[in-house]
Structure formats: C-alpha cells, structure tokens
Curated annotation (Swiss-Prot):
Active-site residues, Swiss-Prot/TrEMBL: 136 (proton acceptor)
Main location group: cytoplasm
Gene for this chain: TSSK1B
Binding site for ATP: 18-26, 41
GO biological process: intracellular signal transduction; microtubule cytoskeleton organization; spermatid development
Origin: domain of life: Eukaryota
Residues annotated with Phosphothreonine modification: 174
Composition bias type Basic and acidic residues, residue spans: 303-326
Single annotated GO MF: protein serine kinase activity
Family: Belongs to the protein kinase superfamily. CAMK Ser/Thr protein kinase family.
Native source organism of the sequence: Bos taurus
Modification after translation (UniProt): Autophosphorylated.
Protein name as annotated: Testis-specific serine/threonine-protein kinase 1
Subunit structure: Interacts with TSSK2. Interacts with HSP90; this interaction stabilizes TSSK1.
C-alpha cells in the first residue's frame, strides 16, 4: 500500500512533498479530524541505517511523545505499518523556517529577534528541565507558524541526559550537528556536556537573527576552531546592535564550558528580560542568579571609522587577551559534522589579521 492510501485510511489527505532524504521524507497532508493541514514525516526502516534504527529513532519517538510546549512543534500521532514504515504526524510550519525567512527578508530588528529568541529559549529551558537535549539547533530547524512565531522541530539527534550516582549529568560522546553551529568542544571530538552544547548553538542562532550572517566561516574547521577558542566575535556596525545584545551573544559563544551561560541566565539576561515579560514569562527564572563569577560585559576594541573605497563595511571585533597557539595535542579531531555556511547561503564573518603585538583593526566585509 502506498503512502497516500495509508494516510487516507488514517484520515489524512496527502499533499505536496516538503522534503526528502535517503530513507525519510516529509509530506503535507490535510487532517479530516483536525480540519487543518499537518506535516507527516515518513521513515522507511528498510532503507535506514542500523545505528539510526537502534538508537536515534527510538529516542526521537520517545521524546516527541513527551514534549508539550507552545514553542515546540506538536506531534499529533505516531504509527507504523507492517511493511516497516513509521509515520510521524506533526504540526505544520506554514511560514517555512527561520533560515529562509532571514535569507528573504534580511536580519531581524532587535525587538523581533528578542521575541523569537525568547520563544526559542523558553522551549530549550522546558527541554533542559526535563533533561532533554536537542543537539542540532540551527535556523533550518526553527519553523514559523502563521503568525511567525518560533516552533522548534527535528529532534532526530535529541536524547535524554543520564545522571551518575551523585546526580551529575554524564557527558555525551556522539558528535552530531552542523559545523557552523557546533561548539568548540564538539569540533575537537571530546566528550561534552550536551546542555552546554545547546547554549553555544543558541548563540550562533541569535547572531544570525540580528546580523543576517554566520559568526564563523566553517570552510576551514581548524581555523574556525582557533578563532572560537580565542573567544573572538565580530559584529557588523551597520546593524547598530545594542551593547546588551552583543554581550548576550558573546557570553553564549564562550569557549570555556564552565563560564558559558546556562539557560536560566539567558532568560534573565538584561537584553531578554525587560521586553520579554508577557511572552511565556512563566518560563523565566526571574530570581535565578549565577553562582559562578560574573564575566565582564562585552566592550569593543578602539578602532578606526574609515571605510574603504570598495564599500567594505567596518566590523567591531570582540577578542580577549592574546593566547599562545594550541599545542599539537589540542588539534581538532575528526568528527561527523556537516559544513553549513555554504549550503545555507549566508555569508560568514571573519576577524581581520593584525601584526603581532599590534592592537586589532576593524574587520571588513561586503555591505
């Protein structure tokens, strides 16, 4: 029995193809019971790899069944046929995904970015409170409803965190996701804290929201990792970002996992909190204070305001004190992550080169 006939028997009228891979595809469908369109993910067990069938698919099904949050794509039904096909009926993101939205309309104004980022962060807090981690946060996995609200989707790499006998979360060893959104510890191929990994990806997403470009160029992973570990972040001056917004991004893109923000600290950050009240404010831990030493706020380096004749735009660069080059032992390990910046069609920002011992000059990029 073909997919259309299977869905018809379950009360769905199959529509157009929304996406397709080697062993899974997503179709739109009209639900005769719900009286609106849905998305149906169809997975063919006969074509899927063993690792996916034994580990990732059971995790995804278990987690989808337990999640219920206004900013997470709803799962209406999961069923399987005798010929080995799994059907996951989900809420449809009628306005597409955030990446296409930004590619079409450009970077978001801070107020719009604040609203969407608060919705996303609230969804991540909900997951983390359940000890669920996503591990593949990226703009393509953030769908938009009819009112352009964020809906977190694609829990294919998600998992429930395990705890040891003392109650501490155990480290993850599966290196997954997209390189452009991956934290330094993941790129190095070492066991990592999955909740902390999610926070780094949130920082990349917020940067893309307000800048319309990638914070790092993943065409050279080794170079990108070095820049990340030096805690260098560039911001386009033309966007006129507030210091509070830059500060939040800078703290999320912290290479030191012991100093990277927690989700409660993000939701209580001064950029998110003042104007986020009323937007799922119950998810915000207003009284939560960090027990860690406070990191100094972001401050730009002094730089020239001159622009080049080729209409290149100065960049404000954030960078700490110079550090020694990494030792051979710190070189990046090979990990199974995909390059992202070329595929998504967004430019990436790179810091400018400076002479040794000289103060950094403003980076430039095409306007």
């Amino acid at each position: 029995m073909d997919d259309a006939a299977v869905l018809k028997r379950r009360g769905y009228i199959m529509g157009i193809n929304l996406g397709e891979g080697s062993y899974a595809k997503v179709k739109s469908a009209y639900s005769e019971r719900l009286k609106f369109n849905v998305a149906v993910k169809i997975i063919d067990r006969k074509k899927a790899p063993t690792d996916f069938l034994e580990k990732f698919l059971p995790r995804e099904i278990e987690i989808l069944a337990m999640l219920n949050h206004r900013s997470i794509i709803k799962t209406y039904e999961i069923f399987e046929t005798s010929d080995g096909k799994v059907y996951i009926v989900m809420e449809l993101g009628v306005q597409g995904d955030l990446l296409e939205f930004i590619k079409t309309r450009g970077a978001l104004q801070e107020d719009d970015a604040r609203k969407k980022f608060h919705q996303l962060s609230s969804a991540i807090k909900y997951c983390h409170d359940l000890d669920v981690v996503h591990r593949d946060l990226k703009c393509e996995n953030l769908l938009l409803d009819k009112d352009f609200n964020i809906k977190l989707s694609d829990f294919g790499f998600s998992k429930r965190c395990l705890r040891d006998d003392s109650g501490r979360l155990t480290l993850s060893k599966t290196f997954c996701g997209s390189a452009a959104y991956a934290a330094p510890e993941v790129l190095q191929g070492i066991p990592y804290q999955p909740k902390v990994y999610d926070i780094w990806s949130l920082g990349v997403i917020l940067y893309i929201m307000v800048c319309g470009s990638m914070p790092y160029d993943d065409s050279n992973i080794k170079k990108m990792l070095r820049i990340q570990k030096e805690h260098r972040v560039n911001f386009p001056r033309s966007k006129h970002l507030t210091g509070e917004c830059k500060d939040l991004i800078y703290r999320m893109l912290q290479p030191d996992v012991t100093r990277r923000l927690h989700i409660d600290e993000i939701l209580s950050h001064c950029w998110v909190q003042p104007k986020a009240r009323g937007l799922s404010s119950a998810a915000v831990n207003k009284e939560g204070e960090s027990s860690r030493a406070a990191e100094p706020p972001w401050t730009p380096e002094p730089s020239s305001d001159k622009k080049s004749a080729t209409k290149l735009e100065p960049r404000e660069e954030v960078r700490p004190e110079p550090r020694a080059e990494p030792s051979p032992e710190e070189e990046m390990a090979t990990v199974q992550v995909s390059r992202q910046s070329e595929a998504v069609g967004l430019p990436s920002e790179q810091p400018s080169k400076t002479e040794e011992g000289a103060p950094p000059q403003p980076s430039e990029t095409h306007a």
